[in-house]
């Protein structure tokens, strides 16, 4: 299930990156907010999944791949990395062990990531 969602995330971001010929401009693309939400969700999952014994996806490596696909300028890249780190830190402050709440958060984060990817794909890649 997570693999299918990630494939959708990757496809959406790849398509969005290809559809923005003006990416060299210092103006944020219209999907920047969704990208930052997606980055935050991935950072949170990077913390929570190993905590709960689910480490089949290396979210940090996947985030690096998505940034590479998007080819952002330095400022945008820093904001995406910052959103990823903020997502990680938000859950690291409150969770020391896997709880039912942590498992529910993972479930919601996967849904949020999937929704962000679908939104990016449907609005900007077609």
Spans of model-derived segments:
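Residue-level marker of intrinsically disordered, low-complexity segments enriched
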Residues: 4-6, 25, 118
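N-terminal secretory signal peptides
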Residues: 26-66, 119-126
């Amino acid at each position: 299930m997570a693999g299918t969602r990630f494939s959708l995330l990757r496809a959406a971001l790849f398509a969005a990156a290809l559809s923005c010929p003006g990416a060299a401009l210092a103006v944020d693309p219209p999907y920047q907010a969704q990208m930052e939400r997606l980055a935050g969700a991935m950072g949170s999952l990077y913390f929570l999944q190993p905590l709960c014994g689910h480490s089949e996806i290396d979210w940090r490596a996947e985030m690096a791949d998505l940034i590479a696909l998007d080819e952002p300028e330095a400022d945008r890249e820093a904001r995406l990395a910052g959103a990823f780190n903020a997502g990680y830190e938000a859950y690291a402050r409150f969770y020391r062990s896997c709880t039912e709440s942590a498992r529910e958060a993972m479930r919601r984060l996967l849904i949020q990531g999937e929704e962000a990817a679908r939104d990016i794909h449907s609005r900007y890649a077609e």
